[in-house]
């Protein structure tokens, strides 16, 4: 079993909602392990090993009864964050790299704005793998923003 070590020495909490993602959750959480960011996992009813695997990376695992509302689940996860800024990601996503100096500079210079991250979607098809790159809103001050919309949720003030 991996020893849980979260330094919580940065101003950011990473919030993740999940359900039955035992094949993805370790890669997701491990990708943030060296950042020192707080990790928050809101589980919406896993029946596989997702929560057990997540417990190897964080003690901050919360149950959220699924109510057919992605915004409600994400807002619940954000409410558990100890830090003023959050990054919200899905459990099948992972961090490739992060420039903490640039992140902290962005937050300091634009405290009332939403930060965007570049997501690379890898789509497998009969023609092989294709990449779709897009910028999405994922970093924000938890006291100023929240999610709205049951499906295709969006960050709003």
Question: What is the predicted function of each stretch?
Answer:
Residues 2-11:
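Extreme N-terminus of proteins, especially the signal/transit-peptide cleavage junction
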Residues 10-11, 72-78, 84, 89, ...:
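Catalytic-site signature of metal-activated, phosphate-bearing donor transferases
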Residues 16, 37-45, 62, 91:
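Short beta-strand/loop segment that forms part of the nucleotide-sugar
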Residues 16-35:
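Short, well-formed alpha-helical segments that are part of the catalytic scaffolds
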Residues 23-26, 48-57, 98:
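Acidic helix N-cap motif at the loop->helix transition within catalytic regions
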Residues 26, 33, 45, 65, ...:
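Active-site-proximal cofactor/substrate-binding loop regions of enzyme domains
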Residues 31, 43-52, 66, 90:
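A conserved acidic beta->alpha catalytic loop
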Residues 37, 51-76, 80:
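Conserved donor nucleotide-binding strand/loop of the catalytic core
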């Amino acid at each position: 079993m991996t020893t849980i070590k979260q330094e919580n020495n940065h101003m950011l909490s990473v919030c993740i909602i999940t359900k039955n993602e035992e094949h993805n959750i370790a890669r997701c959480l491990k990708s943030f392990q060296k950042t020192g960011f707080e990790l928050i996992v809101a589980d919406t009813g896993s029946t596989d090993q997702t929560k057990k695997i997540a417990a190897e990376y964080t003690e901050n695992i919360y149950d959220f009864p699924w109510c057919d509302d992605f915004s409600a689940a994400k807002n619940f996860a954000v409410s558990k964050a100890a830090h003023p800024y959050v990054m919200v990601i899905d459990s099948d996503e992972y961090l490739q790299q992060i420039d903490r100096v640039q992140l902290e500079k962005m937050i300091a210079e634009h405290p009332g704005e939403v930060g965007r991250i570049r997501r690379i979607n890898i789509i497998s098809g009969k023609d092989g793998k294709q990449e779709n790159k897009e910028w999405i809103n994922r970093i924000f001050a938890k006291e100023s923003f929240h999610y709205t919309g049951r499906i295709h949720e969006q960050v709003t003030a």
